Curated annotation (Swiss-Prot):
Keywords: Isomerase, Metal-binding, Zinc
Needed co-factor(s): Zn(2+)
Pathway per the UniProt entry: Glycan metabolism; pectin degradation; 2-dehydro-3-deoxy-D-gluconate from pectin: step 4/5
Reactions this protein catalyses: 5-dehydro-4-deoxy-D-glucuronate = 3-deoxy-D-glycero-2,5-hexodiulosonate
Manner of cofactor binding, per the entry note: Binds 1 zinc ion per subunit.
Function: Catalyzes the isomerization of 5-dehydro-4-deoxy-D-glucuronate to 3-deoxy-D-glycero-2,5-hexodiulosonate.
Binding-site positions, Zn(2+): H196, H198, E203, H245
Protein name (Swiss-Prot/TrEMBL): 4-deoxy-L-threo-5-hexosulose-uronate ketol-isomerase
NCBIfam families in UniProt: PRK00924.1
Broadest EC class assigned to this enzyme: isomerase
EC number annotated for this UniProt entry: 5.3.1.17
GO biological process terms on file: D-galacturonate catabolic process; D-glucuronate catabolic process; pectin catabolic process
Amino acid sequence: MEVRQSIHSDHAKQLDTAGLRREFLIDTVFDADRYTMVYSHIDRIIVGGIMPVTQSVSIGNEVGKQLGVGYFLERRELGVINIGGPGTIDVDGKCYEIGPREALYVGQGARDLRFASLDSACPAKFYYNCAPAHTHYPNRKITPAEVSPQTLGDTKSSNRRTINKYMVPEVLPTCQLSMGLTELEEGNLWNTMPCHTHERRMEVYFYFNMAPDSCVFHMMGEPQETRHIVMRNEQAVISPSWSIHSGVGTRAYTFIWGMVGENQVFDDMDHLAITDLR
C-alpha cells in the first residue's frame, strides 16, 4: 500500500512538474497477478487496480493490518468497474461474473475477496475505489443497462459526452462512495469544461481507452492558479476538494470518476465560468 498525504493548495501551487506528479498522479494502476493500492489521506479514499492473468488475486489480511482493523472491508465499502475482459469476483463464497463495463458494489463487512479472469489472453482489469463506511448495504452487480446515463455538451465545444452513473443514489444505496464512467464521442476532446470544484467532496479520475501515442492534459489547481498533469492510458489522478478537475485529450478517451465526502448529490458543484480561470 502506498500512502499519499493531503496537501494544502498554497503548497501545491509552488510545485514543479515532478512535484505535481508525485503528489497527485497514480502512475501504475494495473500490474499482472497482483493488486495495486494507493491510500490517500484526502477523505481516506483507496484507489487501485487488479489484473489477474495466470492466477487469481485476493486481498488478504495484510491490508487490514495496515488499516488498523481485522480485514480490508471491516469499516469500508468497495466499488469495482471492469474495463478488461470477462472475469469473476468472489465475495465471501458468492461468485459474481463481471464482464466488460460491468461493476460490482461490495458492502461494508465483506471478509474474503478473490478476483479472477476467465481468459488469461484477455484478462479482466478491475479498477476500484474504496471508502470508509458506517453500515452495510447489499452487494450488487451493475450492468451498463442499469446505469443512469446523462449526455451533455456539444460537438461545437468539443465536449459531447455521456456520463454513465453506476454507483449513485438513484441506482443503489452506498454509504458515501459514488462512481461512474464518462465516455467522449469520437472527435470530442474536453471533459468537464466549463469546470467546477466541489468543496464538500474529493474526486479521483482514471483515464483509459487511449491510444499509446495519445495523452490527456488533466487540468487541476485552484481556479486562479491552474496547473496540468499529462496523463497516459490507464493512469489515475487525485483531485482535492479545492481543485478543478477537467481534461483535454489529443483524441477521444474514456474515464472513470469516483467521489467521496460530505454528500452524494451529483449536482452539488461550485460552477466556474471559463472567464474566471487563470
